[in-house]
Amino acid sequence: MTENEQIFWNRVLELAQSQLKQATYEFFVHDARLIKVDNHVATIFLDQMKELFWEKNLKDVILTAGFEVYNAQIAVDYVYEDDLMIEQQHQGQQGYTEQAFQQLPAVQSDLNPKYSFDNFIQGDENRWAVAASIAVANTPGTTYNPLFIWGGPGLGKTHLLNAIGNSVLLENPNARIKYITAENFINEFVVHIRLDTMDELKEKFRNLDLLLIDDIQSLAKKTLSGTQEEFFNTFNALHNNNKQIVLTSDRTPDHLNDLEDRLVTRFKWGLTVNITPPDFETRVAILTNKIQEYNFIFPQDTIEYLAGQFDSNVRDLEGALKDISLVANFKQIDTITVDIAAEAIRARKQDGPKMTVIPIEEIQAQVGKFYGVTVKEIKATKRTQDIVLARQVAMFLAREMTDNSLPKIGKEFGGRDHSTVLHAYNKIKNMIGQDESLRIEIETIKNKIK
């Protein structure tokens, strides 16, 4: 495909996607291919049953793209698989049609090329999921089939799905791979039902080498008759032929309550792995990697401050960097200080800005008063049981009630490391869930501080 042909076709797809509903675009446009543009005629390969739709709905799109790229009115010649094969047989030569047909992928993978194992930041919270994903990519269909990855939003499940697909495709460019969300699988099912073309859907999904399904919990929410049945049959067809299946979800298979038991059982045939929110060190590593995409200087204390503000998922960290970029560009700032970062992310934080007006010294004083120890003892290294508890509670409350980063909190507690603060925070948080009297004590202290 020439450069102009590529620009023309990209523009056709862009215009079509902007005018059509997503499900309609996926069904009628997504698998079409431009073979060539010659003498102001675009030769487009597509399913024969979709030609009428193109004629009625996309003629203006092609005209617009034609004038933009070629400054001419572009006509269309639609060709189908049978046409290409017949022409090849009759001509007996390596003409453009044969070459184009050979280049047509059997299925559009829909993989995002930016996701790979190399740019996935590993930590203790995702190490097993990464190891399992790499194993599956290295030997698809033989190890951990299916692979079921579950965890909350924004933790990297989609990244791993695409990394698996891209890794397999790199080793085998002819592999038939499909990445799709469960929601889009349902949409395709609905379209094929309405058009009475279920054989086409079966052909598309049951002959894959690798099926990557994102957010499978969406399938459990749907009561449309036949959707789960079709996925069940697709799963069986692939699994029986040793073809790899990878699924992601926001919950374990056992908690997919509206999914048929026979599907849940099959999801547990292979390996189930969990991804949990990244710890502080992993968040620092993620931010250090992500800031390379921005033309700003991020001092280490700013990175650690941001890592301390968002601990639920990676998406929040990425969003925070976008917020900071917007503010920095507006103010024409090159170096992102903690103050600039705090200003930029204030609106993003779900509960608004935390009470930064509360000094850590005030928290230490109230905790010390409650437990009968001094602030000096809380900051020191003495490790008697009553002092250690007071110190850890004070660190917990400093993390809960202020905007200060973990390193900053550690500094206020005698220069302790951020990992010490994180350990104290996690320990008290876990104890609160098991010890009702401790929970009441901490609530009492919080009320006095407020």
Swiss-Prot record:
SUPFAM superfamilies: P-loop containing nucleoside triphosphate hydrolases, TrpR-like. ATP binds at residues 154, 156-158. Residues 110-328 are annotated as: Domain III, AAA+ region. It is found in: Cytoplasm. Keywords: ATP-binding, Cytoplasm, DNA replication, DNA-binding, Lipid-binding, Nucleotide-binding. PROSITE patterns: DNAA. Residues 77-109 are annotated as: Domain II. Disulfide bonds: none annotated. One of its GO terms (biological process) is DNA replication initiation. It comes from the Bacteria. InterPro entries: AAA+_ATPase (IPR003593), Chromosome_initiator_DnaA (IPR001957), Chromosome_initiator_DnaA-like (IPR020591), Chromosome_initiator_DnaA_CS (IPR018312), DnaA_C (IPR013159), DnaA_dom (IPR013317), P-loop_NTPase (IPR027417), Trp_repressor/repl_initiator (IPR010921). Pfam families: Bac_DnaA (PF00308), Bac_DnaA_C (PF08299). Its main location: cytoplasm. GO terms for molecular function: ATP binding; ATP hydrolysis activity; DNA replication origin binding; lipid binding. The keyword Nucleotide-binding applies. The keyword Calcium does not apply. GO terms for cellular component: cytoplasm; plasma membrane. Residues 329-450 are annotated as: Domain IV, binds dsDNA. Signal peptide: none annotated. Plays an essential role in the initiation and regulation of chromosomal replication. ATP-DnaA binds to the origin of replication (oriC) to initiate formation of the DNA replication initiation complex once per cell cycle. Binds the DnaA box (a 9 base pair repeat at the origin) and separates the double-stranded (ds)DNA. Forms a right-handed helical filament on oriC DNA; dsDNA binds to the exterior of the filament while single-stranded (ss)DNA is stabiized in the filament's interior. Domain I is involved in oligomerization and binding regulators, domain II is flexibile and of varying length in different bacteria, domain III forms the AAA+ region, while domain IV binds dsDNA. Belongs to the DnaA family. Oligomerizes as a right-handed, spiral filament on DNA at oriC. This is Chromosomal replication initiator protein DnaA. The gene is dnaA.
